[in-house]
Every structure is written in C-alpha cells, then in structure tokens.
Amino acid sequence: SGKTTAIVNRIVNMVNYGDAYTNPNVPENTTEEAVELMQQAYDSGEGAEKVRDIITNSRINPWNILAITFTNKAANELKSRLLDVLGEEGKEVWASTFHSMCARILRMHADRLGYSNHFVVYDDEDSKKLIKECEKNLKLDDKLLSYKSIRYEISRAKDNLMDCAEYRQRTYGDYRAAAIAQIYELYQKKLFDSDAMDFDDLLVYTYMLFRDHPEICRKYAEQFRYVLGDEYQDTNFAQHSIVLQLTQEHQRVCVVGDDAQSIYSFRGANIDNILKFTQLYKGAKLFKLEQNYRSTQ
C-alpha cells in the first residue's frame, strides 16, 4: 500500500506547506484572484506550485525532520525520492537507518561514555573472531556452544537493552546461559578496551547517551522537532526506546507500518511497537493506507 510513499508525501507537505492542511483559517490578505487560482488548482488537480506561496503556513525546516527506517535499501530509496521531489532541500532532511543515525550521533558524543569519538565499528567477522577469543580465554568448549547461538543471545540481549549484569541474573542456574553470560561480559570488556563497538552497540550506547546525559537528548529532540519512522513493524525494543526518548516531550511523531508484514521477529522486531503505539502517544491518530500506490490498476 506504499508505506514509504506515505512518509515521503508527509515530509514533502510539511516542507512545502507547513500546517496549511490543518489550519482552518484563510491566509491573511488573500485577494480574490488568489482565491480563484486556488479554486482552479483544486478543481483541476494541477497548479500546486502556483498556489504554494498563498496557502503555505508555518513551513517546516527540512533539517528539523528526522526520517528513520529499517534497511539501507529503504533509507536510500527515501533519500532519492525526497531529492526528486524537494530538490536540494531534500538533502537537509536527516533520512537514514537507525544504526546510521546512532553512529552519526555517537561520532560526536561517544567520549561521554568513555569511548573516543573515533571508535571502530566491528563487522560480523570481527565479532566472530572476538567471541571465539573469549571462549578460548574462558576455556569453554566451543562444541557445546556454537558461535551462532552465542551471537544470537548477545544480540537479542542488546536489542532489549539488557546489559551483562541483567543477562547474568536471568540465567537461573542454566549452564549454557551462564556460559554465554561469561562470554557476553568478557566480549563487552574487550570491545571497550579496543575502543570498538559492534553493530548492536550503536543502538545501546545511543540509548545510554540519551538516558545518562539528558542535555544531549534534549539537544537532538529540539533539532528533530518532527520524527517519522518507516516500516515500524520491524523495529526492536532498543530502536523504539530511542524514538520515545527523542519525542517524549514534543510528541510530534509519525510512523507507518503493517502488522501483517512483521517478518523480523527472529532479529528482535517487536510488533507491540506498532500495536500499542496509540497507548504510548495519547491523542495519536490512526490512518489506514488503503490506496495502492504500486499498481496501475
């Protein structure tokens, strides 16, 4: 049904027309000629550019808009479409994946967390080598614990903002879980000592940065006065928590998603993020996207 189209159109209307669509007042000093021009544009569906300056009310600066999505492919499509419609102004919208946004923020503030702002981001192969090293250091039998199972458990813990201590408390005497807890703790220590983060840490440390340094969170909340999220059914607890941190004061947030398309639960996606959205944001309005933008039929 074109969820990305809905996000793009929303941003374009905010930048071009501000709150003209919700403002009940006719613009001041509107001439009869202008009213006639607006009526013609309305009747014909053409001439939007001619009436833009007449009906615009409190345009939104593109640099005050944050648009976040789930995959690099979706983020690139979003950027491309905004550039096509808005031109150079489209470049000023912060459009990126959650991880790219977090990396960008941490590059400026990681020193508040004990890292340097030039920290290294480990890829999957780097993480695999480090986890294997931790197993060896702890003299654990790698035949009993596969790399995939260890990586999965650590990643899910981070998706849920569960640190090493909390994870250890939840092992309940289970040998396998206790062994993973040991690896998790040593893995994080070695990452920190190497001034490195893995992909999941980008979310965790951004959340921690905003939690422990509210003045930084406030800075970005004031910059991103309008937050939009695409494919929201695919977000995990950590991603959703960061959105809450940025929007809890101004409450200007718009997300699109389809609860029937949630396919990433194995990666930590939490469908409740969209199902319970109206409970978290009182007064939120729900719109059903029933127009198919992909088909010519």
Predicted regions: what is each one?
Residues 1, 6, 26-33, 61, ...:
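Conserved helicase NTPase motor core
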Residues 1-117, 121, 218, 272, ...:
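P-loop NTPase Walker
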Residues 13-21, 81-85, 108-109, 134-137, ...:
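Active-site catalytic microenvironments for nucleophilic, acid-base chemistry
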Residues 74-79, 102-105, 162-163, 262-265, ...:
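Switch/connector loops and helix/strand junctions flanking conserved nucleotide-binding motifs
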Residues 85, 108, 112, 137-141, ...:
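Phosphate/oxyanion-binding loops and surfaces in catalytic or ligand/nucleic-acid-binding neighborhoods
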Residues 101, 150-153, 157, 170, ...:
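Short acidic/histidine-centered micro-motifs embedded in hydrophobic/aromatic stretches
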Residues 124-191:
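Coupling/switch/interface segments within P-loop NTPase motor domains and analogous charged loops
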